[in-house]
Amino acid sequence: MRTDCKHAFRQLGFIAQDARQDFPISKELVYEVFRQDMGYLILKDGLPCETGLDLKSFAYRLQWHIHGHVFEVIGEYTRVHSGCAEHHGNRFLVVGDSGVGKTTLMTRLLYEGFRVHSDELVMIRHGKTVPFPRRFHIKGDSLHLLPQIRPFIDSVPFVENGGGAKIFAFSPSEAGFDWLIEDREVKLVFFVESNHGGQTVVEKCPKYLMV
């Protein structure tokens, strides 16, 4: 990713991640962002992808284009909307709808001794899972639940949604954790339901009902 605009360059930090991974590179692409009179232009390998974007939205759109192409290349994988972590060597997934608190939970688990690999997306193939290396998208209104990151959160890349609320792109490695992406089998699956402000309860659930 490259750009001719210093403001856009700062926004690219929202996308760039630094997770350790040892998978072969199957393809390389060059994305460019140029500032124009009518907004920002995104190019992929020299060809236009999208134009007329403002500074607040282009990072989201660029990430959408990048991830879309990645999913085409690794089409043999099944995507699961899930966080991924390990405890004492046992890998588990945290599945749930958008807004239930997966990212907040996965970030908090980092500070509770868990190895956390992703907050949003996991790829599955041949019985093994590969966490998708994307920065954790922490909503500004959940920061009161994550006091550990408050001292440095203002230095973390962020974008603003349509309502002006900030969404921070958090990297575990920037907080001193080992952010590692590797394929492993899953031992447990947790399905998270919204219960904001209520008591946390863990219940056993048969696989067919969870599906």
Q: What spans do the regions from the language model cover?
A:
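Post-Walker A alpha-helix
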Residues: 105-106
